[in-house]
Regions:
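Short, charged/polar surface micro-motifs in flexible loops or helix N-caps
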Residues: 29-32, 42-45, 65-67, 108-111
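Glycine- and acidic-residue-biased ligand/ion/polar-headgroup-sensing regions
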Residues: 54-56, 60-66
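Ligand-binding loop in jelly-roll beta-barrel domains
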Residues: 87-112
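A short, N-terminal "cap"/entry segment at the start of jelly-roll beta-barrel domains
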Residues: 1-34, 48, 115-118
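Histidine-centered metal-chelating micro-motifs
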Residues: 46-48, 67, 83, 87-92
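Short acidic-glycine-tyrosine-enriched beta hairpin
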Residues: 73-87
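Structural motif
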Residues: 65-67, 74, 90, 99
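Conserved short histidine dyad/triad with adjacent acidic residue
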Residues: 37-52
């Protein structure tokens, strides 16, 4: 059994610019097919627009509000919203006036090498 505490995970900045604490991934658990992380953005902050060739992502908004853009379509998101980002879809999330905290699940697991920019 593997149980990892969020508080024990060291934050790092991903290629898209968000601050991540990886809860379960290949670096800290016997994970093969997915990863789970907390991502944060400061008020007004945004990820760089990007896509992943291999990974499908789920975002789940924990705190804050944001504008989610996927392949040119924009929607407002808030706590309790789940977002599907298909593999190959261009996407960007922009925090509104307060900071943003989300859970992010990637399958296959997140990799810097699978992040592509405009």
């Amino acid at each position: 059994m593997t149980i990892n505490s969020l508080d024990a995970q060291k934050p790092f900045t991903t290629a898209d610019g968000s601050t991540i604490r990886s809860i379960l991934d290949r670096t800290n658990a016997p994970v093969e097919k997915q990863s789970l992380a907390e991502a944060t953005l400061p008020a007004g902050g945004a990820t760089e627009r990007h896509y992943h060739k291999l990974s499908e992502e789920f975002y789940f908004v924990l705190e804050g509000t944001a504008v989610m853009e996927i392949d040119g379509e924009e929607k407002n998101v808030s706590p309790g919203d789940g977002i599907l980002i298909p593999a190959g879809a261009w996407h960007q999330i922009t925090a509104k006036s307060e900071g943003l905290r989300i859970l992010c699940c990637c399958a296959p697991p997140y990799s810097h090498d699978d992040t592509y920019f405009e």
